[in-house]
Amino acid sequence: MKSLLDLFKQFTPDEHFDAIKIGMASPEKIRSWSFGEVKKPETINYRTFKPERDGLFCAKIFGPIKDYECLCGKYKRLKHRGVICEKCGVEVTQTKVRRERMGHIDLAAPCAHIWFLKSLPSRLGLVLDMTLRDIERVLYFEAYVVTDPGMTPLKKFGIMSEDDYDAKRKEYGDEFVAKMGAEGIKELLEGIDIEIEIEKLRGDLTGSEVKVKKNAKRLKVLEAFKKSGIKPEWMILEVLPVLPPDLRPLVPLDGGRFATSDLNDLYRRVINRNSRLRRLLELKAPEIIARNEKRMLQEAVDSLLDNGRRGKAMTGANKRALKSLADMIKGKSGRFRQNLLGKRVDYSGRSVITVGPTLKLHQCGLPKLMALELFKPFIFSRLEAMGIATTIKAAKKEVEAGTPVVWDILEEVIKEHPVMLNRAPTLHRLGIQAFEPILIEGKAIQLHPLVCAAFNADFDGDQMAVHVPLSVEAQLEARTLMLASNNVLFPASGEPSIVPSQDVVLGLYHATREKINGKGEGLVFADTGEVQRALDAGEAELHAKISVRLTEWTKDKATGEFVPETKLVDTTVGRALLSEILPKGLPFSNLNKALKKKEISKLINASFRKCGLKDTVVFADKLLQNGFRLATHAGFSVAIDDMLVPPQKAEILARAEAEVKEIEQQYVSGLVTAGERYNKVVDIWGKAGDDVSKVMMDQLKVQKTIDRNGKEVNEESFNAIYMMADSGARGSAAQIRQLAGMRGLMAKPDGSIIETPITANFREGLNVLQYFISTHGARKGLADTALKTANSGYLTRRLVDVTQDLVVTEDDCGTSNGSLMRAIVEGGEVIESLRDRILGRTAAEEVLHPETRAVLAQPGRMLDEDLIEELEAAGVDEVKVRTALTCETRYGLCAKCYGRDLGRGGLINLGEAVGVIAAQSIGEPGTQLTMRTFHIGGAASRAAVASSVEAKSNGIIGFNATMRYVTNTKGELVVIARSGEIIIQDEHGRERERHKVPYGATLTVKADQNIKAGTILANWDPLTRPIITEYAGTVKFENVEEGLTVAKQVDEVTGLSTLVVIDPKRRGSAKVVRPQVKLVDADGKEVKIPGTDHSVTIGFQVGALIQVRDGQEVGPGEVLARIPMEGQKTRDITGGLPRVAELFEARSPKDKGMLAEMTGTISFGKETKGKVRLQITDPDGKVWDELVPKEKNVLVHEGQVVNKGELIVDGPADPQDILRLLGIEELSRYIVDEVQDVYRLQGVKINDKHIEVIVRQMLRRVVVENPGESTYIAGEQVERSEILNTNEALQAEGKLPATYSNVLLGITKASLSTDSFISAASFQETTRVLTEAAIMGKRDELRGLKENVIVGRLIPAGTGLAYHQARKAKDAMDEAERRAIADAEAAELASAGTHDAAAEIDGSADTAD
């Protein structure tokens, strides 16, 4: 008892712990926690306000109300500490024990715990092997369950209604026992022998799939009970714990009323019903009355634990559902997300931000009043230290008076004490940065303009929050890691984040443009000082081309010293003057061009790589100052005259209108269908809009001027609008097009495009109809933005949750695996160069020179800019690099596999939370992604349909492996491959471009042909899809019957008739037949596919227009039928954010394509209604077959050989199939490419490695296939690291390891299936997660960041990783020491013991004689 009291006397530092275990409490355990039983439902006495004895707030059970004072007032003061008052029974101690002492309620009848009953899957149901419905009927007294059949034929676990029971009682008498309510269930649970059940189930894992699945589930639950040592009957409560009263307070309001926690109401109900039941049982009340009371008690306990999970929720006086224990921990306002993960911070303030153009990058302006409030404790301590104030109270007065000395002290305190600024929403780590405060007048925080990009802030009323790091460690971290001048790169892409924008860009761009025949052109200057004087004197203008003598500093690689080099440079006045701010070591050539935004970004990047961080920050600041100054001097203005409407516009519009008229004519005469007409019209107008904007830009771009020789020449325009867009300061070509070109096509609310475009632009003005059409797009834009923000935030949350425990934990895992990286080429354009893909990665194997085979890079070497330049010069076109997916570190990642830390520019540090960085990098641009693919201010954008492909570079033609073609009678090559590609290679055999060619295209080039850029490689009809024969012969129709499978369509104008294949659903005949063509040779025999005995059969799809007649002779490559392509709205491509979410959730796309399960030959089997049977036979004769719906487009034909994983039925691929058939690397490539496609469309740069990190987390679980000699069950999902550890242990013992297959989980699923139950519970489905964890008696090893935040420890990342590692090492040392001491003592005791024993034996020998 004494030690217990000592506990309460002083505050004990919390114990170090390394894991948290959750379990279920037995009734004994609950009673051991309790300090007494709560017998009465009363709370406090409303006259005296003292708690009632034995009530819910009883002082005897829970502790005193006032510190060290019993309830009746007999014992007061500290000297009686620990005395229990004999009058009122209260222990004299601190009040705070009322927060930790629990009570209990002894239930008069057992009650089931609703979580184990109703949270799906029902654990009670699994253990008892009964349905939830049946258990509920028993628990709520609607039916009996047989607990002991005795000698009767009744089954144990059998359910019987009341009438059945009465009948059986009459029949068998007292032979059997059947019970109702929780007692019956409890008895059944007690009767279960877990060991025997497990044995039985392990032997029964055969039979139908449903049965196996069910048994495996049950087995898992029983194994969990066995492993955790929890007894199943504990799921039924006999004792209910009562929460300490201070955690469910009763607060007196003014006016003599009380506000109470809902829990008190719920407890009151339980106690009332419990006492009533107890009384009824004592009185031996009729069964039916007691039964009703028991049911009500069960319901009351249910509501207390989880109100509203079953039946109607219990409500209080005001018809509002009461908040139960479960509600307090789940959801956004529950314990986890509101209080543990969403704590509020003291020492913080917020205010509006304004611009601080005079600040240095690492400074921010802090209003004096705010600083005074934030730094109060520091000021107080200084005042006391200086002896100005003697007490805190006096210091407070001094500060409130605002004497001059206080302000002096504030200056002193603030010096070198960084503060953190945060702008909500904090989407990535640059949303919080540290600055050194500068005291300013006024009430707004001043922010440096260059950090706005990182905060995504602007000065239109944004607010920011200030936080003060208090401890020295916190200040140190803020200073070294978070200072704004240390964060100059975006962690998402490694691009500089301190790039100037808007007016600064405009100023720099204007100053660095050149003008033909400007004043002072051709002058030569000795140095920049002379240039400045000439400019000031008006002898030379800013844009004049001149020559200047400049000194450049280059770094000597050997010595590392700067060497000056002076030379004459051709440049302009503006650029020459800017050269003064270049840091040493950066050549002037970087600056000797018109500085657009991209160029400035490159300039800062080059400076960072060549001159280091410090010089770059200073340089960026100087650029900013100059940009502001130059923009002011430039005196830009925009007038309506600057929006030049091209004179060719009228002509283009007239041409388009004529074309539309023609299409209308064709439609009226029935040459084209309504769908085709709409498509073509939209196409014509889309093209017209593009043409107008092209001539407009061409006109804006140039202006005529007279050069020095008096000749008229064109030069780049100085038009203000053009300069703004061209420099990247503001606006885009699409916006200028709306100002001066034409607005173009608009979209309807449902996303379809209105076929009449807005031909006017904003300069000419819109008429009423045009305005009306535009309003919709504008409104939709606003609505979309709101939706998008919420969606994007949720995506980020899921991503963070799945990756939060991924931290760099070691230097090198030593793997030699990796994935091959090559440039991404699409449609002949290099979308992403090899350089961008491998920069900052680690080579996985030697990189060899393609020709000399010399080693250019050793494995394990990081590929930096210089090395990549060497590789590019050598012509390396693919490199195997290490990736996050192939890293073999168990918990976490290794630095080599991750590569460069993009935010800092060096190899990643140990302890960096790369998972969270990846999640933020993908989530942060989410708000920029469109919800739907079109809409630029409502304007519809769509690509004109491509009908040919041309080469962009010179080279040699090659085809990919799957390309196949035939030569038709005209000698043209016709493509019959579904995934054919033309590859153009240079003379070294390096791939330059790659073009997809559709089925049925005509090739205009041959293999190995040398071509020039601009050559047309292939062309095709974009509006129809052909069906082509590969072989020659005579057409023989099968099942082509008019009115049954085909319909005749007669063209009214031309009188020609065509046959159209119609849908079998609309046919009279029940027998399903598919119209097809067989080919017959001259002898009337069916043509066979060479090398097989399959006849050539070509099936027609629904909607195909048959182009040949029965008995017609056809040659190879001839078109048998055409399928018109339907309108372009039909397959809505999910674009933007939903597409990214879909990929990361690993959802199967609707209308998914089908991949070949194995390599083999295609054949078609017997058809069923509406489906085709597709078969693949592999070389060993194994057959795989699948039914494919007829409306699907089958890409293969009889006798074709396909490879495993090849697309055989058209449609988007399912990532699960890709993983199963093609493996992890292919899957990762698919997801990375698809996600990047979405972001690239918006011009957002994200490094591949972030996406790889997330794919790694999606693949972290595996499915056990064959458990070997492990304890797993086949089909069980386990963590990859866990099974690897288990297998290592098994192999060490010479046992059979478990085999497993990869499984891809969506991010939500992966977050919930994490090993850490704390993390999963705080994410989603709290109840389910906790129920499962409790049954399994799970241990949370606190590996991730989230768990540690929740339990309030330092996170195991960054500086915290070192702390935890040091602590663990120390604990291990202490443990070893303790063991050593214990062993030594034991040895000593043992040796002493042997002495004694020897002495005893001697003694006994003596006494014997």
Swiss-Prot record:
It catalyses: RNA(n) + a ribonucleoside 5'-triphosphate = RNA(n+1) + diphosphate. InterPro entries: DNA-dir_RpoC_beta_prime, DNA-dir_RpoC_beta_prime_bact, RNA_pol_asu, RNA_pol_N, RNA_pol_Rpb1_1, RNA_pol_Rpb1_3, RNA_pol_Rpb1_3_sf, RNA_pol_Rpb1_4. It holds the Pfam family RNA_pol_Rpb1_4. GO terms for cellular component: DNA-directed RNA polymerase complex. Zn(2+) 2 binds at C813, C887, C894, C897. Transmembrane segments: none annotated. GO terms for molecular function: DNA binding; DNA-directed RNA polymerase activity; magnesium ion binding; zinc ion binding. Binds 1 Mg(2+) ion per subunit. Binds 2 Zn(2+) ions per subunit. Mg(2+) binds at D458, D460, D462. One of its GO terms (biological process) is DNA-templated transcription. It comes from the Bacteria. Its cofactor is Mg(2+); Zn(2+). Its EC number is 2.7.7.6. Gene3D superfamilies: 1.10.132.30, 1.10.150.390, 1.10.1790.20, 1.10.40.90, 2.40.40.20, 2.40.50.100, RNA polymerase II, clamp domain, RNA polymerase Rpb1, domain 3. Zn(2+) 1 binds at C70, C72, C85, C88. Keywords: DNA-directed RNA polymerase, Magnesium, Metal-binding, Nucleotidyltransferase, Transcription, Transferase, Zinc. The RNAP catalytic core consists of 2 alpha, 1 beta, 1 beta' and 1 omega subunit. When a sigma factor is associated with the core the holoenzyme is formed, which can initiate transcription. Belongs to the RNA polymerase beta' chain family. DNA-dependent RNA polymerase catalyzes the transcription of DNA into RNA using the four ribonucleoside triphosphates as substrates. This is DNA-directed RNA polymerase subunit beta'. The lineage of its organism: Bacteria, Pseudomonadati, Pseudomonadota, Betaproteobacteria, Burkholderiales.
